Amino acid sequence: EKIDFFVNVLRFIKSNAIALFNETSLVSQSGGQTSRLDSLKNCLLKLKQKKKKTTIGKLYLFSDAFFPFTDTLKLIKSEKLRIDVYAPMGSKNDSLIEKFVKENKFNFIKLSDRHFKH
């Protein structure tokens, strides 16, 4: 299944990993940053440089760990991309994340495991 493939790719990216996939392949990834927000900014910059943003269609975003704040989700919303978000939970702010996801009608899928690579 593609979800298993996406998770396996994510496991090999440095901590604070964000990976963006289309239906069949990795289209952008970033890790080793001080935050997942910075990793997402790098991913989006790479997409824009490749000029894929407008032709990419639906994307799947995978995070190696939970989102401690809504900042990453707010950036996704501001980019107006069709993105399904896959991430584990476990932050003390999970209730804020869940509230934001519900209010903004995100397709948010909870993963059972974290995949840090230090």
Language model feature labels by segment:
Residues 16-17, 59, 104:
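Structural beta-strand/beta-sheet cores of well-ordered domains, especially the beta-sheet scaffolds
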Residues 10-13, 51-55, 77-78, 116:
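Solvent-exposed alpha-helices and their adjacent loops that cap or buttress functional pockets
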Residues 19, 60-62, 85-86:
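Structural motif
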Residues 25-73:
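Glycine- and Gly-Pro-enriched alpha-helical subdomains that act as flexible
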